[in-house]
Amino acid sequence: MRLKTEIWVKAYLRRCAANGAFAVVMRHGDDDAGAIFIKVVRGGAHAAVFAPAPAGLDDADFDRRWVAALGGNFVPEREAEAALAREISFDSDLWIVEVEDRAGRHFLGDDLVE
């Protein structure tokens, strides 16, 4: 059974804080089943985006799986914002969590699909 989105996000925010990063909900989506996008800002001007993995890459052993969007690279923050705006136009119930970390860590651990 999958955790409700709101609970997963709260736990993720705590994980980021425990590791010395600042994380905040930039867009609050559906509490029960909204998709979550993670934006990691490094150095204030560049960002990477992590998106929910497609259904075929989902694994029963993990609550949620992630893929690196935008080629898995840090891009100018305005490009990351434009990509997220496109996602919002498709899904108005999605969440966006922004993480500010000097090292650019995403804190998704093994849940990231390479």
Can you say where each PLM-predicted feature lies in the sequence?
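Polybasic/polar functional segments that serve as interface/processing modules
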Residues: M1-E114
